Amino acid sequence: MDDNNSDWTSYDFGNDTIPSPNEISLSHIGTRHWITLVCYGIVFLLGVPGNALVVWVTGFRMPNSVNAQWFLNLAIADLLCCLSLPILMVPLAQDQHWPFGALACKLFSGIFYMMMYCSVLLLVVISLDRFLLVTKPVWCQNNRQPRQARILCFIIWILGLLGSSPYFAHMEIQHHSETKTVCTGSYSSLGHAWAITIIRSFLFFLLPFLIICISHWKVYHMTSSGRRQRDKSSRTLRVILALVLGFFLCWTPLHIVDLLILVSDQPSERFEVNLNLAHVLTLCLAYINSCLNPLLYVCLGRGFKENLISSLRSVLHFASEAPTHGPSMTTNSKSTTDGVFREKPV
């Protein structure tokens, strides 16, 4: 159960309620709590411009291609996820008090996890696509088209919506006092909470992680098998390690903490405070993955940095010239972005 602002550890089980870490004042956390807010702010400041830049380059400064569709949708999902941070930081700075009402509680929680799930699924699709480019090059040349990529991206958004449906359905506000309202998840039984946690961890973490690892390992193995390719194998290995470690390190702690929350039935007050802090910090790590994606999946791609610089120069050139020079700038810019994403694996 993931939520940085709402208490996903407080489930309504009829007459039995798991103690809520949010019922313990965050003033006990002190400096660490504000450090967490600073971390969230840094993620916002890095993730928003980074992903917005990728959206701009892939959506407006390069030709339509399969890779462009992958990275455009990935950047949109990560951008929307990062844009939600300021709203979700408000309760964190107010002792978990949710001031936005019941509808916003459901919408912000559900949409946030929808974006995260779409991001994970897109990483899987990118890995499988690179695997097919290496193992089935002829098939990809005949069947790999931007139209199919757009359809698959649409399906991914639908799957992300379905995966986040428990958050839309079970998030609600609870009044802890006259001045404090908490956005929390309410379930009918502990078994129900366990089922959702296990299914989510398998479908949106364990299975994607295995697919990403196997796909990239196969890509590395095949691209380094020939003598002419060995010079590039070390760079390929570095990129693959960055991709796999980035995904693993950003997502594993969150799922471990989620399981600890369910296992710890009646923890001590000190343990509850530490567990709540750990949950917030591991959510920050998951957010960091949204910052790393543009760097790992785009900036390490062939030709992206050169074409990004070229596009920025074109914009500056356009801004400094008269409007009559606009068409020539557009034509030149178009020609410089043809190689942003080559239809080959890294």
Curated annotation (Swiss-Prot):
Q: Which residues cross the membrane?
A: 34-60, 66-89, 107-128, 150-170, 195-220, 239-261, 280-300
Sorted alphabetically, the Gene Ontology cellular component annotations on this record are: apical part of cell; basolateral plasma membrane; plasma membrane
Q: What kind of membrane protein is this, topologically?
A: Multi-pass membrane protein
Provide ranges: composition bias, Polar residues: 327-338
Q: Which SUPFAM superfamilies match?
A: Family A G protein-coupled receptor-like (SSF81321)
Has keyword Membrane?
yes
Residue positions the entry lists as glycosylated: 4, 15
Please verify whether the record's keywords include Transmembrane helix.
yes
**Keyword terms:** Cell membrane, Chemotaxis, Disulfide bond, G-protein coupled receptor, Glycoprotein, Membrane, Receptor, Transducer, Transmembrane, Transmembrane helix
A Gene Ontology annotation in the biological process aspect, one of them, is:
chemotaxis
What GO terms are given for molecular function? complement component C5a receptor activity; G protein-coupled receptor activity
- Subcellular location per the Swiss-Prot or TrEMBL entry: Cell membrane
Name one matching Pfam family: 7tm_1
**Record-stated family:** Belongs to the G-protein coupled receptor 1 family.
Full protein name: C5a anaphylatoxin chemotactic receptor 1
Per the UniProt record, the source organism is: Danio rerio
Its taxonomic path starts at:
Eukaryota, Metazoa, Chordata, Craniata, Vertebrata
